[in-house]
A protein has these predicted regions:
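Hydrophobic packing residues within well-ordered alpha-helices of enzyme cores
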Residues: 2-6, 127, 261
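Signature of the SF2 helicase/ATPase Hel1-core->accessory helical subdomain module
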Residues: 71-196, 273-278
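Short glycine-/polar-rich loops that comprise or flank the Walker A/P-loop
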Residues: 11-14, 114-117, 268-269
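General structural signal for secondary-structure boundaries
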Residues: 61-64, 140, 185-189, 255, ...
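A substrate-engagement module of RecA-like helicase motors
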Residues: 1-91, 99, 149, 160, ...
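Short amphipathic alpha-helical interaction/hinge segments
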Residues: 26, 128, 230-233
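A contiguous, basic/glycine-rich beta-loop/short-helix subdomain that forms a polymer-engagement track
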Residues: 66-86, 91, 102-109, 198-278
Length: 278
C-alpha cells in the first residue's frame, strides 16, 4: 500500500512482493521435477520473455500478476517472481528471505559482500525469536528409525548409516531423564556426515522410490543440523529432551542470534527497524 501511495505521488520504481513458494505453486502437489510439473518443463526457455514482458507493463508486481503471467507463458510463478526481483528497486518479503540460512535469496546475498541494500525491517520485535528458530536445529530419534525402514530395501548402505545415528541417539536417550545438556556431540555429527554422504550417492542413482518424501525431509533436516553445528559457539546450547508424544529429540538451540543477524545485515548499507510494540 505504501508503494502504491508513492506511485500515486509520482514515484517511479519497480516493486516486487515475494510470496512463499507453496502459495505460488499452481500444481496440486509441489514437485519441481520437470517430469512431473508442466511449468518446470522448459521453464528456462520461456522465462526471459515472461520477465521482459512484465517489466514493460507493470511497476508493482503482486502474486496475482505473477500467477497470470506464469499461466500465459507456462513458467514457474515463484521462479518468475525471483527473476523479476533481480530487476526491482524494492522487494517486499518475509524475514526468511534475508535472514534464514536455508532460504535466503542467494542471487542477492550469496557472494557475502556488502551491497547498496537498505533493509527496512517491520515488526522488529519478532525478529529475535524468529532468528532463534532459524539458527536452531532439531532432530528426532524416531525419524531415523522410520526412514531406515523405508530406505532399507533400496540402499543397505544408507540404512546402515541411519542405524548408526539411531544408536548414538539411543545412548543419549538412556542418559536423559527429562532433558539433558550435552557438552560434546562430535560423534553424532560425524555419523550425520556419513549418512549425508551416503544419501548424496543414493539420491544421484535413485530418482524415485516409495518414501522419497520422508527421506528427503530427514535429509534436509540433517543438512540444516550440520550447518548449524558448524556455527556452534558460546551463543548455543545443545540439549536432548523427551517430547510430549514420548519421542526423543536433540536440539542445537541458538540462545543469542545477534552475530548471525549482524552477518546478514552487514550485506547491506543500512538498516531501519520498525516496531509499534518496542
Amino acid at each position: 500500500d505504501a508503494f502504491r501511495i508513492l506511485k500515486g505521488k509520482g514515484y517511479q520504481a519497480k516493486t516486487v512482493l515475494i510470496t512463499a513458494k507453496e502459495k505460488m505453486c499452481v500444481c496440486e502437489e509441489m514437485d519441481c521435477n520437470p517430469q512431473n510439473c508442466p511449468y518446470a518443463e522448459g521453464h528456462f526457455d520461456r522465462v526471459n520473455d515472461a520477465v521482459f514482458e512484465l517489466l514493460q507493463k507493470e511497476e508493482i508486481f503482486t502474486r496475482e500478476i505473477f500467477l497470470e503471467q506464469a499461466h500465459r507463458h507456462r513458467v514457474c510463478p515463484f521462479e518468475l517472481c525471483l527473476d523479476t526481483a533481480s530487476w526491482a528497486d524494492n522487494i517486499i518479503c518475509d524475514y526468511n528471505y534475508v535472514f534464514d540460512p536455508n532460504v535466503y535469496l542467494r542471487r542477492f546475498f550469496a557472494e557475502g559482500t556488502k551491497e547498496e541494500y537498505l533493509f527496512l525491517v517491520d515488526e522488529a520485535h519478532n525478529l529475535v525469536e524468529r532468528a532463534r528458530s532459524m539458527y536452531s536445529a532439531v532432530l528426532v530419534k524416531e525419524d531415523f528409525l522410520a526412514v531406515k525402514k523405508l530406505v532399507k530395501p533400496y540402499s543397505k548402505k544408507v540404512a546402515a548409516e541411519l542405524e548408526k545415528c539411531n544408536k548414538i541417539l539411543l545412548a543419549y536417550k538412556r542418559e536423559c531423564e527429562d532433558y539433558q545438556i550435552c557438552e560434546n556431540i562430535s560423534n553424532f555429527a560425524f555419523a550425520l556426515m556419513r549418512f549425508g554422504a551416503a544419501a548424496d550417492t543414493f539420491l544421484q542413482k535413485s530418482t524415485e522410490f516409495p518414501g522419497k518424501k520422508e527421506f528427503l525431509d530427514l535429509y534436509l533436516k540433517v543438512r540444516h543440523f550440520l550447518n548449524m553445528y558448524e556455527r556452534l559457539d558460546e551463543h548455543y546450547v545443545i540439549y536432548t529432551q523427551f517430547l510430549e508424544n514420548h519421542s526423543f529429540m536433540i536440539k542445537l538451540f541458538c540462545v543469542d542470534p545477534a552475530l548471525n543477524l549482524q552477518e546478514c545485515l552487514d550485506k547491506g548499507r543500512s538498516t531501519i527497524f520498525f516496531s509499534a510494540t518496542l
